[in-house]
Amino acid sequence: MSKDLDKEDILYKKRHSIAHVMAEAVLDLFPNTKIAIGPPIKDGFYYDFEFKKQITEDSLLDIENRMREILKTGSSFEKEIISVEQALEIFKDEPYKIDLIKNFDLQNEVSIYKSHNFVDLCRGPHVENMNKIDPKAFKLTSIAGAYWRGSEKNPMLTRIYGTLWNNEKELRSYLNLREEIKKRDHRKLGKELDLFSIHEEIGPGLVFFHPNGAKIRALIEDFWREEHSKNGYDILFTPHIGKSWLWQTSGHLDFYKDSMFEKIEMDKSDYYLKPMNCPFHIAIYNTGKHSYRDLPFRWAELGTVYRYEKIGALHGMMRARGFTQDDAHIICTHSQVLDEIKEVLRFAIYMWSKFGFSNPKAYLSTKPDKSVGNDSDWEMSLKVLEETLSDFEVPYEIDKGGGAFYGPKIDLKIVDSLEREWQMSTIQFDFNLPERFNMTYTAEDGKEKRPFMIHRALLGSIERFFGILVEHYGGAFPLWLSPVQVVIIPVNNIVEDYAIKVFNKFKNEGIRIKLDNSSSRMNAKIREYQAKKIPYMFIIGEREATEERISIRTRTNEQINGMKLDEALKFILFKIRDKEI
């Protein structure tokens, strides 16, 4: 239900207006508080404050109540255009507003909005008056810290988040979804299901996969390798570290150094942990001479990279400092570009489908003001990307001028079961690195030419994709991805021999199966394995043992009684081999 809103959308205006109402309520309840900025955002709004005494979430209800009192006045939101000098006078006691104003051209005018007893430096837009806002359709949701202007060098402010919708029903729907998102948080489920951990004392942003999580990751990676081999890719392995000349040549030290770990001095040379895999693949390409007959090369790697993310930006598996990228680079001729791009998109859509995702949306980024490469290559590559999206009927938006300086790209996004949009795949032309590393091939006319290079990732970071899967399925992974697929629960010792026979029969077929012959009560076992999200429980009693059958209980409490053993095996194997979602 969440989406980015246009500034002229009524909900955008309502959220902008309620942020002003919240600021007034805060100033009423906490005099001498300093105000910073308060924009509408996806799903709601926020406002940043500097409090004399830090508040807690216990204060949110009081602020909400005061906001409703202000809304009852029905006051108008009135825009005024004033000079910069007037603005400096009005906000003379507001240091953060003064900081904003001082960045304005002194010859220009600025706009302010007045509502009830509040004045704010603001471009708008807003609703006409407070009667347009349903007082039952908003809620303050959380408090967080935020540096002024996003810089750690500046003061830490208190950010109050809220959400607002058109009516109470929409609000309730959103809050219910928010609760479900909390329940499915991959950090919470990662602990409950023993999937992974992060140890701050060892290093923030570094992910440790436990046996259950490692099994799922191995299944993802095995499937990835198998499908890439089927689709004409060769698998590469490259080092985690490289000398500084490599990163200087690639341009990373000039343009990406802030996101790299500090250099490592060794053997009188400087080394860096790799933030990307591309230069290593180019190094392999440049080990020999290539003819047009050799192309295209499709080289793929599950390459672990390291990027310095600020502590505050880290978020479990979704934003880590060490992660494995499902990178590939396609090196081809001009005439091969269209077919290669189409094949990448087809492959991406297929891969997502096996994990339960469909109906992608694309964002096509075009040439920025500053760029490398010639105009004809840019025009050709953009045309190829647009044609490919149209052929596959993928809806897309154009991000004009939003491309990297070295080439246009497509970002492909999917929507999960919680209605959230995730960027999954990137298809990126690169007119920069082939030039920097002097990549060539011998063309049909015998001349040396520059190949086209296409970067692509289908799943992105394996860690991030893992986290998305955890939340998408709420930890209840499809059968083929579940670390334990079946648990056998014998009802008593009399049937233990048959239970062992069933266990061995399924295990020999490669099914990940567990036999629980502990003394715990059967109902307690069922509850335990349902909580662990095990897909199937085989309940074996004396009748099942006598007739060589099993009774099946699912993690969602469905039951299939008295299925023949061989039929049960076929049933499970089919679901696994078909990768049924």
Swiss-Prot record:
Source organism: Borreliella burgdorferi (strain ATCC 35210 / DSM 4680 / CIP 102532 / B31) (Borrelia burgdorferi)
NCBIfam families in UniProt: thrS
Enzyme class: ligase
EC number: 6.1.1.3
Assigned protein family: Belongs to the class-II aminoacyl-tRNA synthetase family.
CC terms in the record's Gene Ontology section: cytoplasm
This protein's name: Threonine--tRNA ligase
Residue sites binding Zn(2+) per the record: C278, H329, H455
